[in-house]
Amino acid sequence: ICALQLAGGLDYLVRIAENILRKNPKHINYLAPTVTYFLTILAGTGHTAFSMIPVIVEVAKSENIKPSVPLSIAVVASQIGITASPVSAAVVAMSGFLEPFGVSYPTLLGICISTTFIAVMITAFIMSTFSNNDLSSDPVYQERLAAGHVAPPREKNVDFHLKPGAKKSVLIFLIGI
């Protein structure tokens, strides 16, 4: 993961995720956890979610959705993604425990990826359906907005420059997985 970061591959993946969220802002409650989940699966660490937090907040605000809703699901999704990542220590350890019982590594991955992703989507549905998503009806936000403590959402960073080997580093990393 360090080599991927140094080559700019992680920045490239985050940029792709940002584009997905910004192109589909109305579905932020489902896409934010999906993006952080798959970033975690690819990277093997939940730290990739940190780079998505500002984007999730901005996109949610632009759609009048409380940022706490997609953020809470996204953070949980990134941590659950660790238990489904083929490069995480958690999955490697679990495969060591289950191998004597006849559960192969690919079988374990199939079970973990499908069940954890379904759980994330069910949680996103529950949060989207049963929580108050309307940012304009939040009195605390309205107070902070009136006091000038809340910054307006910023647009996509157009100054982003991709490092020369970023795309290749992602390809090499994916082949290595």
Each language-model region and where it sits:
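Long, contiguous bundles of hydrophobic transmembrane helices that form the permeation core
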Residues: 110-177
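Primarily residues marking transmembrane-helix entry/exit sites
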Residues: 26, 68, 166-170
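Juxtamembrane helix-boundary/capping and inter-helix hinge elements in multi-pass membrane proteins
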Residues: 6-9, 22-23, 59-69, 95-106, ...
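Hydrophobic alpha-helical transmembrane segments of polytopic
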Residues: 28-32, 71, 172, 176
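Membrane-helix interfacial "entry" motifs
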Residues: 21, 25, 100-104, 108, ...
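Membrane-embedded alpha-helical segments and adjacent helix-loop junctions characteristic
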Residues: 1-62
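Small-residue-rich segments of transmembrane alpha-helices in multi-pass membrane proteins
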Residues: 26-30, 84, 145-149
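Alpha-helical transmembrane segments and, especially, the helix-loop junctions at the ends
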Residues: 36-53, 66-111, 116-128
